[in-house]
Curated annotation (Swiss-Prot):
Alphabetical GO biological process terms: photosynthesis
Phylogenetic lineage: Eukaryota, Viridiplantae, Streptophyta, Embryophyta, Tracheophyta
Transmembrane segments: 7-27
Protein name: Photosystem I reaction center subunit IX
Cited Pfam families: PSI_PsaJ
Length: 44
């Protein structure tokens, strides 16, 4: 179990999880607001 925790805390695994979640977030934003140069919740 300790080896699995050590493996999951290495940089390539964490980078893969981080970039995967970031890509998913950007995809969902582009799905909700297609071709948006300004987002409605950022305009003041």
């Amino acid at each position: 179990m300790r080896d699995i925790k050590t493996y999951l805390s290495t940089a390539p695994v964490l980078a893969t999880l981080w970039f995967g979640s970031l890509a998913g977030l950007l995809i969902e934003i582009n799905r909700l607001f297609p071709d948006a140069l300004t987002f409605p919740f950022f305009s003041f």
